[in-house]
Amino acid sequence: VQIFDRVENGEMPPKSDDMKPADRKALLAALEPSLHAASKAETDLHGRGPMRRLNRLEFEQNLRDLLALPHLDIRDMLPADRESRHFDKVAATLDISHVQITAYLDAVETALRQAMVTSPAPPASKKTRVVGRKLGPRGSVGGHESMFYARDGKGLASLTAKEQEAAWTKDEPDLEMTLFRSPGWPYAVFPAKILATATGEYRVRFSARSVLQTTGFVLKKGVRTVPMTFRSRKPTGHDQAEDVRMTGGIIDVRPEGGVYETTVYLPAGQTIEYGMLGLPTPQIDAQGKTGYYRYPPFPEGGQPGIAFQWLEMEGPIAPASWPPASHRVLFDDLGADVKSAKPAEDAKRLLRRFIARAAREPVPAEAIPQFDKIVLDALQKGTP
């Protein structure tokens, strides 16, 4: 086709007088029908765009939709996709190797295991409420201007390690935990004893107000809303933090205060970290002139922030039905224990049901028996 185009444009032969106009016209007329027919046949068979595999983000999203797992996270199990001109959806660069095939199979197995449940009932729900110093860490993170506890609108001095141990045995509901910084590094600001007992969604309620920090750590009523979010993370120090992700959406905390509610998604063993938005991130003072942290000068009128009075988390929230939708995608109405009076018959039915859901185009009937054999062999051997 490229040669045809160059001949048609007079670029070939190199010298224009090597081919007479009549010969050029005759050559093009002879080649055009066959080239057009070949191009049309290829387009009819494969489409106009080149076929490519899904990149890892698309693959993850497809598994989420297929298995009804909206929070499935398997992207990092797959090798990073090559890019072309900053795009990772170019067919020529989306090659595939045995390493990727192995990673894809591992990711799919992980997703299938997450989709299945084995318990006859959802995990038990638990409610935990914290007040006072249990709303945050024992010490400030980023200097005293960044975070402190307050009573009656006045900031309290930092406690010694011995005083902290004694203070943490009390609830002190009259204290507020005030936060005037956005996340950065180092940063580990999360409530005590708030922990996900099982992977799932949790309902979070808290009482808070937006405030202004003025000279001497004195609090004034805020003059605008302060946006915040939560971040899922392990309850570890900042040097051990990993897999930190925003959850629960954006919440605007008002000056008049109130009770706010959101839903967060947490893997088992994780907690929620406060994530103020648009506030300073104190930097370590490398020159050592102002102490360990360098908090920027306050805006006129005071530094905006949020004061928290209490926080509670309840969950995991049970799905509307049990087993959940992801389990029913695989096993339909066979229940959490997957018991069947006719295992072979149900296995074939579920296989065809899943193929119809997963396939992008009709699957020929003659292609299915080979998968029947795999499933029935596994049933006979008792393979889980």
Describe each model-derived feature in a short phrase.
Residues 2-11, 19-384:
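Low-complexity, glycine/serine/threonine/alanine-rich intrinsically disordered linker
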